[in-house]
Amino acid sequence: MPDLANTPARSERAMLLILAGIQFCHILDFMIMMPLGPFLISALGISTHEFALLVASYSFSAAVAGLLMAPVVDRFERKRFLLGIFLAFAVATLLCALAPGFVTLLIARGLAGIFGGMMGAMVHTIVADAIPFERRAKATGLVATAFSVSSIAGVPLSLLMADAMGWQAPFLLIALLSAGLIWFGYKALPEFHGHLNSRHQGRAIRQMIAVAIEPNHMKAMLLTALVIFGGFTVIPYITLYAIANVGIAADQIPLIYFLGGAATLLTARLIGALADRLGKVIMFRVVAIAACVPVLLVTNIGSVSLMAWLAITTLFFILVSGRMVPLLAIVGAAVKPQERGAFLSLNATVQSMAMGLASMLGGLFITEAPDGLISGYGWVGLVAASFNVLAALWVSRVAIRD
């Protein structure tokens, strides 16, 4: 395993930028599905229920991928494994663009979810392997800017392309970007062998179970689930609530993504730097508790001006996504290096399952009134805020082993 602590800063930054690009591709691939809903429903002649299956197939496939990946991931060199699954992801995304109907698109989305879920876990594994703990939160913040760039440029550009060339265009764009990044990754990413020298012998399934049931690992995975429930109970229904209750026009929705993404592009690295300076646990608690404010505002505000709504949603983006920066550093340090790949694969499974379950939990509270307004969203906000408080209390139980 290379010691990037002593390599030139330029090499380390190049590695982090490539990893951020890989994150951008699979995050955009996931994010774009919900705003593409009207295009897909019209073009494929599907129902809203079938569209929901298209969205859910990615998360649940990613969860399955984590289970499949965990027993074997630490037996492979990191760079080759990442680029291999990235290539498979690019092919699956290309199949999405070529899908002629609902069933084939559903299968392609499932495949994209499998490899996209693996990619996310492997990116964070490499960051945890390569960057010393005292600088890891800042590095994680740089990689996390992939979410911001997806929101600022990826989603608006994809919607413009879909409007001009059809719903297939965004998937073609992602496949082409992935192909370019695979080449850059092959040229610039270092190889990682350190975990291979200290891997445990024995059956893969037995090793995975041992990693999964280790008490500190379970505490870290529970922390991840609490954080996801603290945001994803709310996130899937923001657009619906904005249009029905706040009075935001449909063509103004991209502004939410653009401004929120632009803000997090700046704040993710700031939060990471503060976490390195003040402490990951302290910074996580501050951001998680602060996130309760925009969570409750977004779900209870009612009809307000566009400017007021954008201010609230931008704060929501900053703090809800900002929790992930110290969280990923804490979770990555909760495991020994030789078990990190397997653990983060399992943690990715927990994250994907939590996303699906959280969105379903939020849906249990939400109903559409006869006048078209959305009711029950305020209760969703209270539930999400409660999970954030629980996460802030629970984080100190996770032991740092790096």
Regions found by a protein language model. Give the residues of each.
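Juxtamembrane intracellular "pre-TM" segments in multi-pass secondary transporters
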Residues: 2-9, 190-222
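Cytoplasmic helix-loop-helix junction between adjacent transmembrane helices
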Residues: 108-149
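Extracytoplasmic gate region of multi-pass secondary transporters
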Residues: 33-34, 217-258
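Helix-to-loop junctions at the C-terminal end of transmembrane segments
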Residues: 66-77, 267-279, 366
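Conserved MFS/SLC helix-loop-helix module at the cytosolic interface between two early adjacent transmembrane helices
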Residues: 64-103
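C-terminal transmembrane helical hairpin of 12-TM major facilitator-type secondary transporters
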Residues: 281-327
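Helix-loop-helix hairpin linking two adjacent transmembrane segments in secondary transporters
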Residues: 142-189
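A membrane-interface helix-boundary motif in multi-pass transporters
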Residues: 163-175, 364-386
